[in-house]
Amino acid sequence: MEMFQGLLLLLLLSMGGTWASREMLRPRCRPINATLAVEKEGCPVCITVNTTICAGYCPTMTRVLQGVLPALPQVVCNYRDVRFESIRLPGCPRGVNPVVSYAVALSCQCALCRRSTTDCGGPKDHPLTCDDPRFQASSSSKAPPPSLPSPSRLPGPSDTPILPQ
């Protein structure tokens, strides 16, 4: 009887491990629709644009004995193919180029975080609002939803991957 219980427990644990490893409930890394705030220094306006960004789950691993073994590289959701679109900000004074470009994710991949194409830091407090305090209350006619993921910034300071410490 004990052998039967042991086999049953082993069967249940192996099935649970298989199901959990597939991560069926977590959306994988893919382009998703997002609303971003767009502003430019010197222009008295901040508007929102609809675009696609890369977001979602990338499988990662961590070591149990972190002090003994070296850290494993962690992958994040990155742009694979990207297109840039431009918009003209209304009301910019003469001498200020009113054209602003932003990224549109065409495809995404799980890879090491590269600062040349990805914001490797934590999420901004309010990724969908303007940075200039003059525009905080009036960045758009409709406030963007607060639940959207933080957008990645393009380009960044270097192409060095971020590894865990």
UniProtKB/Swiss-Prot annotation:
Glycans are attached at residues 33, 50, 141, 147, 152, 158. Residues 131-165 are annotated as: Disordered. Keywords: Disulfide bond, Glycoprotein, Secreted, Signal. One of its GO terms (cellular component) is extracellular space. It holds the Pfam family Cys_knot. It is found in: Secreted. Belongs to the glycoprotein hormones subunit beta family. Heterodimer of a common alpha chain identical in LH, FSH, TSH and HCG and a unique beta chain distinct in each of the hormones and confers receptor and biological specificity. This is Choriogonadotropin subunit beta 7. It comes from Homo sapiens. The gene is CGB7.
